């Protein structure tokens, strides 16, 4: 998700095509082409410019609705429905996941090309966390560059959030509290405070504190690797 303002001018974008198996956007005002995954202009008058990212979550509607009960949902375009077109089905990822990947000779086979990864970029470093790793172990405590982070899998076993795990200069270690009916809960070893999936402490010495959110990009391995060639992969090790 990107801000649409460049040099004080609001740009309007349309889908223009695909480059390296990733969407290209074209702005009406200058005709510049922008790469969707990076927000960078790759052709045209604004080539080399970078759109400013807007923080967002990629979570299930059920989790979003539970956290934002008064939230609004974008209404479907009536013109699309009237023209007989259909919106992408809810299980579109299952279909896409079975599609073949057109790749060059430099294929990184450490993971299957359609393996879903949660990509984190911090401190000039990029790390790919396979969704399957989080489904086996959550939370994941890690360092991305010099930044201490924690990744948490939601109750739906599909939504993932990441946070910097430092409070007042102190690194926190987390484990998931089990046997509770009140939703996902994490406890930090240092203070015993209890935290929710939003990264907010609601009980204990740190009650009311909020962990700093870290952007997580849900992507296929082949695409993440293409735009983050120096990425590492988080490894759970033998299990």
Segments (PLM) and residue ranges:
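Mid-to-C-terminal functional-domain signal that highlights helix-capping/loop sites
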Residues: 1-239
